[in-house]
Amino acid sequence: MSVASQDVVLADLTVVIPVRNAARLLPECLASVSREGPSQIVVVDGNSIDGTLDIARQYPTIILSDGGRGLPVARMLGVQAAKTRYVALIDADVVLPEGSLARLLDEFTAGGYAALQAGLHSVGGPGYWGRALAQHHRSGRSKNWFGVVATIFERETLLTVGFDHKFVSGEDIELRWRLAQGGRRIGVSTRTIVTHRFDGDSFSFARDQFAMDGRGLAAMVRKHGWRGARLLALPAAAAVRGVLLSLARLQPQWLPYYVCFAVGNYLAMIDTLAGRPRKAES
């Protein structure tokens, strides 16, 4: 794609970035997004108290508030505010390599996709849990699963299908389910790769990641019944695969991680399916 045609296409794309206390991650994310030159950058804040808004104001952004109502609401507020045909949902923990947004949009339009996510290269901190999370995401099958970390949609698709606001996590899985059920083409790019950063390097951070995954899978079962029940096996399958790969690669240091991953997922699933209230987030 020529530079001129890139400019024309990106002029019809809005980037939506939902944020909540993302001051550590947002500067590099916004710098990379701004460099790409989309028509609009919409930052939707969830009652941040750490300087996130001050950072957002340093860039040519439209700033909205979701009132702390969560990611599904934040993303849809951004989509509704967009004035362009295409919308890219970019999380604050993503950094876009130069030219990646135009390449992803070119692949999206050429392939007739309803939604296309960039491939993810995950990185973590230098400690055990940061490295473990990153290696799991780089080596696990989930890296090829469609999500909304760095994903382009037709704006009209999101306005029509949208997110289920009742989901506090796993809304990406639920959206993927409904898009696929509706016969829409979705995918993950193998040509355009972006950096995905874990903003934590502690056991408590990893535990929260596991809990969010488990709650999301359980919420799918609660909504979709037996059709979603097979999702309950995913953490066990991922843990077994991770253990076997760790042993085969002579990397036993990751075994505790996969045990904690499975236990954390299933404890959160049980709480969600039992209807127990989750702890309020800080």
Predicted regions and their residues:
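Acidic donor-binding loop at a coil-to-helix junction in glycosyltransferase catalytic cores
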Residues: 169-177
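Glycine-rich, basic loop-to-helix element that forms the pyrophosphate-binding segment
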Residues: 66-82, 145
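A conserved acidic beta->alpha catalytic loop
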Residues: 32, 45-53, 94
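Active-site donor/metal-binding and catalytic loop motifs
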Residues: 189-207, 216-220
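Non-catalytic, C-terminal membrane-associated alpha-helical segments of glycosyltransferases
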Residues: 208-216, 222-282
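Conserved donor NDP-sugar-binding/catalytic core segment of glycosyltransferases
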Residues: 95-128
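Short, well-formed alpha-helical segments that are part of the catalytic scaffolds
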Residues: 21-35
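Short aromatic/hydrophobic "clamp" motif used to bind/position activated sugar donors
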Residues: 87
